[in-house]
Amino acid sequence: MNKKSIRDIDVKGKRVFTRVDFNVPLEDGKITDDTRIRAALPTIKHLVDGGAKVILASHMGRPKGEKNPEFSLAPVVARLSELLGKDIKLVEEAYGPVAEEAVSKLEEGDVIVLENVRFYPGETKNDPELAEGFAKLADVFVNDAFGAAHRAHASTEGIAHHVETAVAGLLIEKELQVLGKALSNPDRPFTAIIGGSKVADKIGVIDHLLDIVDTLIIGGGLSYTFLKAQGYEVGTSLLEVDKIEQAKEFMKKAEDKGVKFLMPVDCVITKEFGEETYVGSRDIDSIPADHMSLDIGPKTVELYAEAIKASKLVVWNGPMGVFELDKYANGTKGVAQALADSDAYSIIGGGDSAAAAEKFGLADKMSHISTGGGASLEFMEGKALPGVEALNDK
C-alpha cells in the first residue's frame, strides 16, 4: 500500500478526526449485527493508546440530509462504550460550535462520536464548506471506513484536502493489502466466483478479473443471461436480454485468454418465486418454459467445489441463489463450505457473500471478509477509491 497509515505518524496530543463505518443494521433501535463496530476497534485502540484525542464520525442509513432520530448513532455509542469499556459521549452535531466545544474539552485518550454525518445535505455532495467544518475539529484525518471509501463525500474525501495529515486506519490498510495483492500479485491457481442477481452490476468486475484469474465461476441470477447466450432456454428465470451480447463477449474473452469459465450444469427450479411451488433440481437443458431457477443444483456445487479445491486463492463476490430462502440456499452454502474446507486463501467481497458466510456459521473459516461491498467491488474493477486517493502518499 503506497498510502501512509496511522502506523506512520505520531498522534500524541493530536485531535484525530477518524471516519469509521458504523452503518450497522438496526431493528427497533437495537443493533442486530455489530461486525462493523468491532472492525473499527483496532484503529480506535491504537489511537487511544497513542494518546490521541479521538473524534469518530460515521454515517448511518440514508436520512436524506436532514436530522432524523431514527438514524441517530446513539445505539452505536452505547455498544461502543461496552466494547471499549469506557463511557463515550455522543455529540449532537457533527461540525460547528457545539462540536468544536466538545472537541476542545478532550483529554489525551478520550473518545467522542459525532452525530450522523448524513444529517447534513453537504455530506453526500462533498460540499467544501462542510468538509472545512469537519477539518476545523482536527489536526489529523484518518479514514478507516472502507465500506464508504468508494464515495467522494465530505467526511471521506473532502476533509482530506483541508488537513495537512490524512492517513489510513488499520482496517483500510489491511483491506488494501489483501485485495491489492490478490489483484496485482496473486497466488495461483487463482479462482474468482461471481454471483448475485445482475450482470449489469458486475460488468466491470468480470471484465477486470478475466485479465487476472485462471478460473472464473459464474452463479446466481446473472448466470441465466450467460446460459441464454449459450443457447439454453432458461424459462422464467431472471434474464437481462440487453446483456446477452455482453455475456457472449465475456465468454469469448475467457476463451482467448485461456481462462476456464465455469457455469451451472444443473439448477433448482420452481413454478413461482417462493418455496410453495418448489420442484427440485434439473439439468440446465431441462428448465420448463413456465418455471424459473433460484439456485445452482448439486452437480454444479460439486463442479465448483472441485475448482475451489484446486485453487490457491479464491475471491468470492455474490451468492449462488436466493439463499435467504432455505430451499434455495444449498448452492451458496455448498460454495461457502467448499471455501471453508479448502486450503486456498479465501477473500469474501462483502455484502451478500459475507452475510451468507455468517448465516451458515462459516465466517470464521474464511481468510478475509471484506467490510466493503461496493468498495471492494469497485476496487476489483481496478477503479481508484476516492477515500483512499485523497490520503497522504508514503
From Swiss-Prot:
Localisation per UniProt entry: Cytoplasm
Superkingdom in the source lineage: Bacteria
Residues that coordinate or bind substrate: 21-23, 36, 59-62, 118, 151
Keywords carried by this UniProt record: ATP-binding, Cytoplasm, Glycolysis, Kinase, Nucleotide-binding, Transferase
Pathway the protein acts in: Carbohydrate degradation; glycolysis; pyruvate from D-glyceraldehyde 3-phosphate: step 2/5
CC annotations in GO: cytosol
Family indicated by similarity: Belongs to the phosphoglycerate kinase family.
PANTHER family assigned to the protein according to its UniProt record, in alphabetical order: PHOSPHOGLYCERATE KINASE (PTHR11406), PHOSPHOGLYCERATE KINASE 1, CHLOROPLASTIC-RELATED (PTHR11406:SF23)
Protein name stated in the entry: Phosphoglycerate kinase
Source species of the chain: Exiguobacterium sibiricum (strain DSM 17290 / CCUG 55495 / CIP 109462 / JCM 13490 / 255-15)
